[in-house]
């Protein structure tokens, strides 16, 4: 599955795109290009500010595929300490094409929704295996002193399904834990 499909957009601080052959400093072993995704830097209170508290909430809905999701983040920081949480969930059913694009399979007598797999039917404008469901959580802690920064992030991703339309390589019940 495409590597960027694992990312929660609300946790991305910056994206860098290298077209063509990438420099050795960013991997260097790609021919068609590289995309570098970086998480957001920790936030600290300004000198003399005391403590900093901030949060963000968002949601989306797209009618095609009934796609929906939400994200939440919260940060508490002083001049030298920062703790943050980000969480997001997203899911979608199969999406629909702009019109009927599938022909009847295996003869004129078949149900128009027949897919070639017994007991499985899709409408003629439905793009099969495009559904997904994912949940992401990250807890970050950082300490800053002078020009030094110590940062740790704990992450958990639960991806019950990420289907793949052009290959039979659907991902089911994938769980990732990272430090």
Predicted regions and their residues:
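A beta-strand signature from Gram-negative outer-membrane beta-barrel systems
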Residues: 5-56
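Short beta-alpha junctions and helix-cap segments that line functional grooves
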Residues: 1-3, 21, 71
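A generic helix-loop boundary/linker signal
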Residues: 5, 25, 64, 128-131
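Alpha-helix N-cap/helix-start motif
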Residues: 24-28, 67, 94-95
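Periplasmic-side early beta-strands and strand-to-turn transitions of outer-membrane beta-barrels
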Residues: 43-44, 51-52, 56-58, 62, ...
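Outer-membrane beta-barrel signature, preferentially recognizing the C-terminal barrel domain
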Residues: 18, 169-179
């Amino acid at each position: 599955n495409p590597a960027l499909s694992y990312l929660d957009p609300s946790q991305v601080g910056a994206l860098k795109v290298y077209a063509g052959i990438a420099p050795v400093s960013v991997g260097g072993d790609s021919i068609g290009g590289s995309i570098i995704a970086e998480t957001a830097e920790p936030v600290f209170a300004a000198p003399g500010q005391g403590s900093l508290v901030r949060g963000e909430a968002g949601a989306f809905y797209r009618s095609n595929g009934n796609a929906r999701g939400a994200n939440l983040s919260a940060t508490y920081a002083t001049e030298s300490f920062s703790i943050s949480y980000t969480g997001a969930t997203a899911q979608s059913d199969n999406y629909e094409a702009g019109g009927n694009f599938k022909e009847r399979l295996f003869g004129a007598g078949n149900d128009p929704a027949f897919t070639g797999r017994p007991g499985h039917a899709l409408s003629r404008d439905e793009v099969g295996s495009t559904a997904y469901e994912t949940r992401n959580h990250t807890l970050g802690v950082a300490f800053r002193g002078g020009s030094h920064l110590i940062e740790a992030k704990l992450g958990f991703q639960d991806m019950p399904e990420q289907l793949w339309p052009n290959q039979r390589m659907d991902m089911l019940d994938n769980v990732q834990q990272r430090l």
